[in-house]
Amino acid sequence: MLRRGILRCFSILFVLCLLALVAGGAFLYLTPAGRVDRGTTYILVSPGAKYKDVEQQLQNKLWLRFPSAFRYLAQWKGLTSAPLRSGRYAIPRGATMPEVIEILQTAEQVPLTITPTALRTEDELITFLTSNLWLRADSLRTLLRDSSFMARYGATSETFRAEVLRQPFTIAWDATGKTLLDSLHSGYLRFWKG
């Protein structure tokens, strides 16, 4: 009789512990990953970035509530071992930890809309573009000074700067220099074709 009572007590205790673990896991799984007082947060993943860099950025921008739980879930889902895709990712307000991990693993990056100001010199143009995009200034300068590359636009380095209008254009944050110049040129052509 006493043995049966002890067994029943242990089974009830086991069920209660199991329920507490399930409730705690559900709480962590369904609770927003970061502060909910902010709107959309943008995470910038540079080419070749490691998980630690992204985790630090998430902590700084999103203020992860449970960083160690997020790290374990990211390891379990394979975010820490797989190479990260570069880009600019939008984390919506109130996103849970699994949603943040899914965005970083599978989502398309959010394009960036840039409106150039009055850019008169090559240095002003390069500084403006490289401050908004993940692009090295020396690679963009090399493309702008390459006369054979500029010939594909029917322009020179000096005349191409005139194609950078004060019109907003949309481009991926991690675009290459060629993609950027193609986008600027197509925006110029669209503007003049009406």
Q: Can you say where each PLM-predicted feature lies in the sequence?
A:
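Conserved catalytic or metal-liganding residues and their short signature motifs at active sites
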Residues: 2-194
